[in-house]
């Protein structure tokens, strides 16, 4: 009997999901992406060699693992082909193992132009998108006017829909944002060129997942971004345009929730955020700078510096509830090495002095102060440690306290960037 295991982020993204997916796919027959697009940036380090994936599932570096892109993912053909080419240049076979749902929405040049024009127009009030067209592509999907991967293989139908879409979007670009129009013929020609390359990789991903399930194969579901960026449950409006929480798995892959056996919540040992939006535990002092430097906290997709702060048990409790988390993977524990004291946020105090839980929108965070519990740090190095017993006592106490505060077990601890620098206490596929 196979198991279906989910790996998703519990914070604002950048928790280290790529490494853990790569580690666990040793036991998986297939890995599927079910939401987001090439705004994701999953960094894998294998034998010291770094690989960053944006759209292709992280299982691609494991020989024989099938990689699937589900209907909930927005696909930019140009970005996908660049990523495939880079991997092939490294000797990684991709086209034989990558399959893409025909129902996945396309990101095209006008989505990128709109995304960037809107952020520019917002000025200081910008959301902090990656500018890669993710939001506008999801808008077209929900408005039922979007083009999908399967449309690429019907030229006349595709051209007719594309013409209508460009009439609609170019009007905004030219008249409202004062940006140049997107050319119809150039866009059509580019898309038809990509169609020839993508056609052999197209597959009914939902049907394939159920075939694998019925055959008793282990399947990994790879989330992108983090729970606090969910369009419904995140710090709205400073969120992404997809459901990053567990509910997005079923809608984005076609595999119902009753078939999911274990949900692993990837959680950084401190907290980071890229772009705008509330961040109660953010540090503006030397400690924050130290975390950023040691943790190499720069976005793998945008290159933007990440904001850093103390561990926030409040948002993790919310993520555990929303996702029905089975177990936690605590990453980047080694970044905390050498700190004399470490703070954990255990609640938020509002203007009336009452301690409250996580709000459901960005405005409700205004005026909140984090309530901290101070713990002793440790001077010993935890980098590369592979057993719980080898960790300093203070590090073990920190892990135990997090478990107590959030009500979920820490099943995996990451002590470095390489797939081998990991402590596995309970294996999700066991």
From Swiss-Prot:
Protein name: Adenylosuccinate synthetase
Chemical reaction(s) catalysed: IMP + L-aspartate + GTP = N(6)-(1,2-dicarboxyethyl)-AMP + GDP + phosphate + 2 H(+)
Subunit structure: Homodimer.
Signal peptide: none
Keyword Magnesium: yes
Protein location: Cytoplasm
Reported cofactor(s): Mg(2+)
Functional note: Plays an important role in the de novo pathway of purine nucleotide biosynthesis. Catalyzes the first committed step in the biosynthesis of AMP from IMP.
Binding site for Mg(2+): 14, 41
Organism: Pseudomonas putida (strain ATCC 47054 / DSM 6125 / CFBP 8728 / NCIMB 11950 / KT2440)
GO biological process, one term: IMP metabolic process
Residues given in the record as IMP binding sites: 14-17, 39-42, 130, 144, 225, 240, 304
